[in-house]
Amino acid sequence: IASAQYDDDEILAMTRAAAALVARWGVQDEAAEQLLNGEGRAAALLGIHYALRCIFADSDRVARWIGAPNEAFGGVCALDLMLEDGLAGMQRVEAYLNAEIAS
C-alpha cells in the first residue's frame, strides 16, 4: 500500500481486512504472508474481493472461485497466479473480474 495515498490508520485497517479475507479464502501460513507482504497488495486483494462479491452473492462460492482452475489464466487458479506473479498477478485477476462485471 502506498503510504502517500493513505494514512497509517487506513493502511492498518486495509491490511487487517486483507488478512481476514485471505483467511476466509483458506490461505494460511507462508502463502498468506506471500500474498499480504508488499506495497499495494492489500488494496489489490480488497479490489479482487469487491469484484468477486459483485459477481457472487455467496461467500463460499467466492472462496471456491479463487482456488478453481480458470481458462482465462491458462488453467491456473487465481490463487496460484497471485502467489506466482505477486502484485502483477493480483492486478491481472482484478482486471479480469472487472471486465467480467462490465460485460
Q: Which residues make up each language-model segment?
A:
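Non-transmembrane "mature" sequence context
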Residues: 1-103
